[in-house]
Each structure stands twice: as C-alpha cells, then as structure tokens.
C-alpha cells in the first residue's frame, strides 16, 4: 500500500469513529429528554425547574459529541 491509500483509510476511519462517538450522546439526549417529559407529566408544577435542569444536562451531553468531533481531527 502506498501513502495515499493509507491516508484515505485513516480518513475514513476518522469518519466512522466520529459516527460511533455520536451514538452515545444521541442515546443520552433521548433518555434525558424522555425522563424530563415523564417527570413533567407526573408533577407539572416542577416543569420550569425540570426544563432548566434538562438544558443544563443537554449541554453536558453535547460536550461529549463535540469531544468526539475534535478527537477525530486531533488523532489523524
């Protein structure tokens, strides 16, 4: 194999790696939002506080996706 072919394979693996890294935050967001909706349905008076906490958790979960995206570029 020549260098160009190896670079193409490494580039493709980075894309696959980011795709796998995005699965975790996607599942996390689904669970987070689902549980927030479930909790709001049980206790509607806490809806505002739960929504605030959900957005805070959403920010933390999205950091994982961004780290996966950045890692794909760093480890080329």
Curated annotation (Swiss-Prot):
One of its GO terms (cellular component) is proton-transporting ATP synthase complex. The keyword S-adenosyl-L-methionine does not apply. It is a multi-pass membrane protein. The keyword Repeat does not apply. SUPFAM superfamilies: F1F0 ATP synthase subunit C. InterPro entries: ATP_synth_csu_bac/chlpt (IPR005953), ATP_synth_F0_csu (IPR000454), ATP_synth_F0_csu_DDCD_BS (IPR020537), ATP_synth_F0_csu_sf (IPR038662), ATPase_proteolipid_c-like_dom (IPR002379), F/V-ATP_Csub_sf (IPR035921). Its main location: membrane. PROSITE patterns: ATPASE_C. It is found in: Cell membrane. One of its GO terms (molecular function) is lipid binding. CDD domains: ATP-synt_Fo_c. It comes from the Bacteria. The record marks 62 as: Reversibly protonated during proton transport. The chain crosses the membrane at residues 13-33, 55-75. Keywords: ATP synthesis, Cell membrane, CF(0), Hydrogen ion transport, Ion transport, Lipid-binding, Membrane, Transmembrane, Transmembrane helix, Transport. F(1)F(0) ATP synthase produces ATP from ADP in the presence of a proton or sodium gradient. F-type ATPases consist of two structural domains, F(1) containing the extramembraneous catalytic core and F(0) containing the membrane proton channel, linked together by a central stalk and a peripheral stalk. During catalysis, ATP synthesis in the catalytic domain of F(1) is coupled via a rotary mechanism of the central stalk subunits to proton translocation. PANTHER family: ATP SYNTHASE LIPID-BINDING PROTEIN, MITOCHONDRIAL, ATPASE PROTEIN 9. F-type ATPases have 2 components, F(1) - the catalytic core - and F(0) - the membrane proton channel. F(1) has five subunits: alpha(3), beta(3), gamma(1), delta(1), epsilon(1). F(0) has three main subunits: a(1), b(2) and c(10-14). The alpha and beta chains form an alternating ring which encloses part of the gamma chain. F(1) is attached to F(0) by a central stalk formed by the gamma and epsilon chains, while a peripheral stalk is formed by the delta and b chains. Belongs to the ATPase C chain family. This is ATP synthase subunit c. It comes from Bifidobacterium animalis subsp. lactis (strain AD011).
């Amino acid at each position: 194999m020549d260098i160009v072919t190896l670079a193409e394979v490494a580039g493709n693996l980075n894309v696959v790696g980011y795709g796998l890294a995005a699965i975790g935050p996607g599942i996390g967001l689904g669970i987070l939002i689902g549980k927030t909706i479930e909790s709001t349905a049980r206790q509607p008076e806490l809806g505002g506080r739960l929504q605030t906490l959900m957005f805070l958790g959403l920010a933390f979960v999205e950091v994982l996706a961004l780290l996966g995206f950045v890692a794909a570029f760093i480890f080329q």
